[in-house]
Amino acid sequence: MIAAALFAAVLSFAQSPGEDTFIHPELVGNRGRGEVKIPDIEGYITLKGDFHTHSVFSDGSVWPNMRVEEAWWHGLDILAITEHIEYRPKKKYFNDSVDHNTAYEIALEANKKKDLIIVPGAEVTRKKPFGHMNALFVTDANAADVKDPMQAIENMLAQGAYILWNHPGWPDDLCTMYDIHKDLIKQGKIHGVEIGNDVESYPVAYDWITEYGLHPFANSDIHGYIEAVFASRRPMTLVFAKERSLEGVKEALFAGRTLSLTADNLAGRVEYMAPLVKECLKFEVYKDKDTYCVYKITNDSDIRFVIEVGDTMHLVEAEPGQTVKVEIAKGQQVTFRNCILGKGKYYSINQSEL
């Protein structure tokens, strides 16, 4: 009798008010936001962003509202849809009301149901040596639609744009710093560079952060459905902002407060790497001996850290949310092999500083 009553209750719950339709509640989707735990650092909020994506309004294959949904699902705080100015293969399917601002406007409307920071932007697209440049925080992307790419950049800069040099190793797998880039950097007209793009990283470009003063980024450059491209967490740029707002993000980018995150590899300047590692990893002395200490290391982030103790190539993996024990000799160097400061250079501190 009880079983029959329970079955009737479940059946009643699963049915719509009518008799001819049956709803299966186990099939009803309600995907939540997958938070990415990366702590704030002293004085700043840590925001997670993707500053290079595409939709159907250039050569992407999804509507801009899906880019907003994906970014929210994946725990991002910031999203820029940066359509190619010069390459719009689907243009014939749209009417004359569509321009270079349309994707941003649709994303902004879709974001009313979310709480992302939507950055207006566009991608100025040329072959090397010029390459591809994103203009971020633009007020009218149509002003970039001119024949001369240098004039396009000037028009964007006149709007207060931040210029990001995209995928310097694409399409020839060579990261070449051409004279045109050196001149633009010297004039303060290129501000950042993608250390990571899609599933690639560019080790040569790691050194450009210190050598040329560029700010590091890692972005998805997604064109298709993002779940079909990345087997794990999408690339993202960490932004250390004074406040969670569009103006806060803009101020942080122009100040250069960024780190790139590709897979579990962080890259950028030591002044932001050091405080982030300090907040992510908690070192607690478990045993204090004459010549060494045993530490309990707790990873309070969603980044997997690889720690090298001394020069013995003894690697300790600190997985997200886990605590590991490790013996460290007093005065020994501790190197974080997933924290990149340059090509072949990693963030390292002495045991006495732990």
Predicted regions, residues:
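Charged catalytic cores and adjacent phosphate/nucleic-acid-binding surfaces used
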Residues: 15-49, 68, 131-138, 173-354
